[in-house]
Amino acid sequence: MAPPAPRTLSFLLLLLSLHLTASSKLNIPKVLLPFTRGTRVNFTLEASEGCYRWSSTRPEVASIELADQDERQCSQRAVVQARSSQPTRLTSIIFAEDIMTGQVLRCDAIVDIIHDIQIVSTTRELYLEDSPLELKIQALDSEGNTFSTLAGLVFDWTIVKDTEADGFSDSHNALRILKFLESTYIPPSYISEMEKVAKQGDTILVSGMKTGSSKLKARIQESVYKHVHPAEVRLLILENILLNPAYDIYLLVGTSVQYRVQKIRQGKITGLSFFFFLNVLYKFLTTKKF
């Protein structure tokens, strides 16, 4: 079979180049990093495919360092780091140029001051001696924009007395902070490194010790943020009670069903609390108007 003509080969190479150009993307168009004086906060940029040479227009604001660099001095991933020495909003443009196609990808790296922090979670309730709850700090700038990462920033997490918890004089003992190293859950790598040196990051686990209400407070440890108000969250610790059967049951008038209440601890049914019967004594009539 004859080799492809030069024009055909050039056309195929052009199509391949256009395909690579169209499909290559960065994982994020803009990244917002917090200003710090001690801790350096990093964020990893990653292209979908290809090998890139990375650069920063203002490395004194946000530097860029290759990750997994090969012999061609290029990488598909790079780490951007906040380096600004001024407590004001500054921007550096990160460029990534594909060494094969020449395609240039762009990401704006913005460094700004943290104005407010809050604690976010999937729920405000957790069950006694059950799976722990993950709590995470979310930081906002003065305009309410959310920072892309707080990786490496040190926080002080403390359990404080809940003065609004009536009837629970020792509510601060209802909760305990659990290290990821003590659990069966996998944290971000930077959290593991911080726990090894007895530091707390933006993500923690909490576990219920006794029923009640408890309050948790988090504060940024870095001195430049001593004016930022601590974030607080109130958690409710409940007994894990299961009603069996747990599904909907439809009964006729004059019939009954037996329920049993079970208590669950550490994923296991500890025993039966009690049985009770539900009797249907009345028939409810409904009318519809058409």
Over which residues does each language-model region extend?
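Extracytoplasmic soluble-region selector
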Residues: 2-290
